[in-house]
């Protein structure tokens, strides 16, 4: 096992995992290259957290192959954990330790800490490190975990819904920090069900559904997934909106217009509606669940499977 010479920090092929009769992973493939911020996307229950638990050596796979920093996450867990940092979506801390003590303890498990970066991150995230962990809100517990991971010497970050509990200002700080980590050459696997967060941070994306990889590639190659829902209350007649390229699923009921529009055509559609006269207009990016329903035709069997599968 080598953690020093690896062009592919994460290499997963045909990964399977069952929990009783529930199939959590069903032949999953995932490749994350060195220095990459890689989005790992899927609706809740798709198998993202199970995959991360296998990478962390907390769960043993039933089948397939997994290489993490050149090693086996199940048999080489102790050595590998000196080079990786993990941030879960719901952080649990030692209640009697202060935030600062917890940051240092976690970082020591990861091969040490950059004290200057630690101090900078505490200030940027607005954390009081002298308070006991038992007094922290969910957002502050999340900050402790993020600060420890980002100030450590880890070469690989495994992030499972890491911005959960952060307010919009702190989420912006988090995104800046991930960009800085990438500039330092750190590899990041970001598990999320939020498409916008992934678009802001990641250059590559792997999308999974029901424990299988359904798409993987650059964000530019996956732009067809990103459509915005439009609902407008009209004053005038907008005309034939189907003539606008990238506008689909158009429905008109009385004065209410609904449509789906590609990001490249959104501005043109809004201009056309505005010229016709609009009382109100609401635009909403699609949820991942909507994207999967639209692009991958989720059937009731798969939907039910996702409800019971380990996330």
Curated annotation (Swiss-Prot):
InterPro entries: AAA+_ATPase, ABC_transporter-like_ATP-bd, ABC_transporter-like_CS, ABC_transporter_ATP-binding, DrrA1-3-like_C, P-loop_NTPase. One of its GO terms (cellular component) is plasma membrane. Disruption phenotype: Inactivation of the gene leads to a 4- to 8-fold decrease in minimal inhibitory concentrations (MICs) for ethidium bromide, novobiocins, biarylpiperazines, bisanilopyrimidines, pyrroles and pyridones. It comes from Mycobacterium tuberculosis (strain ATCC 25618 / H37Rv). PANTHER family: ABC TRANSPORTER ATP-BINDING PROTEIN, ABC TRANSPORTER ATP-BINDING PROTEIN NATA. This is Multidrug efflux system ATP-binding protein Rv1218c. CDD domains: ABC_DR_subfamily_A. It is an enzyme of class 7 (translocase). Its EC number is 7.6.2.-. It is a peripheral membrane protein. Induction: Transcriptionally regulated by RaaS (Rv1219c). Expression increases in multidrug-resistant clinical strains (MDR-TB) compared to drug-susceptible strains. Keywords: Antibiotic resistance, ATP-binding, Cell inner membrane, Cell membrane, Membrane, Nucleotide-binding, Translocase, Transport. Residues 10-235 form the ABC transporter domain. ATP binds at residues 42-49. Belongs to the ABC transporter superfamily. The complex is probably composed of two ATP-binding proteins (Rv1218c) and a transmembrane protein (Rv1217c). Pfam families: ABC_tran, DrrA1-3_C.
């Amino acid at each position: 096992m080598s953690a020093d010479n690896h062009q592919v920090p994460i290499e997963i092929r045909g990964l399977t995992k069952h929990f009783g009769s529930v199939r959590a992973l069903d032949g999953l493939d995932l490749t994350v290259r060195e220095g990459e911020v890689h989005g790992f996307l899927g609706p809740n229950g798709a198998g993202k957290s199970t995959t991360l638990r296998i990478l962390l050596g907390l769960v043993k796979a039933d089948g397939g192959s997994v290489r993490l920093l050149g090693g086996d996450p199940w048999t080489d867990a102790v050595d590998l954990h000196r080079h990786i940092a993990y941030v879960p979506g719901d952080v649990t801390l030692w209640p009697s330790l202060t935030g600062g003590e917890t940051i240092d303890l976690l970082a020591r498990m990861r091969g040490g800490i950059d004290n200057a970066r630690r101090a900078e991150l505490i200030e940027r995230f607005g954390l009081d490190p002298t308070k006991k962990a038992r007094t922290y809100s969910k957002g502050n517990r999340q900050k402790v975990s993020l600060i420890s991971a980002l100030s450590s010497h880890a070469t690989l970050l495994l992030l499972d819904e890491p911005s959960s509990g952060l307010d919009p200002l702190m989420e912006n700080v988090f995104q800046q920090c991930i960009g800085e980590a990438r500039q330092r050459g750190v590899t990041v696997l970001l598990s999320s069900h939020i498409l916008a967060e992934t678009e802001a941070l990641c250059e590559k994306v792997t999308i999974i559904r029901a424990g299988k990889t359904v798409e993987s590639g650059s964000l530019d190659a996956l732009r067809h997934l990103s459509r915005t829902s439009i609902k407008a209350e009209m004053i005038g007649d907008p005309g034939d909106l189907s003539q606008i390229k990238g506008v689909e699923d158009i429905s008109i009921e009385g004065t209410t217009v609904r449509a789906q529009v590609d990001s490249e055509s959104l501005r043109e559609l809004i201009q056309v509606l505005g010229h016709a006269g609009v009382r109100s207009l609401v635009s909403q990016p699609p949820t991942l669940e909507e994207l999967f329903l639209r692009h991958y035709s989720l059937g009731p069997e798969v939907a039910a499977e996702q409800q019971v599968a380990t996330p």
